[in-house]
């Protein structure tokens, strides 16, 4: 999956918006693209690297996903009880990544 496909997928959800919320923290050294629904973030990734995404996840599913896939790692600067990072082009199929991104959107949309 490439960055354009992933961005288009995240923006395909009703009410989804994209923003670059972390500019002031990294002073232009890193650029993150984040996706929101109802003003709340459900996914983000570093634009320059595009090596992983961070998404909200059902707490009951995190341990199972971590055991099943090496590509599931603790998130950077998010609560690991509710968020995971998924490395792209690793052992998790794109179809499963998309399912989890969709699930993240649904979790956040209901908040």
Task: Locate predicted features.
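Charge-dense, helix-prone N-terminal extensions
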Residues: 1-111
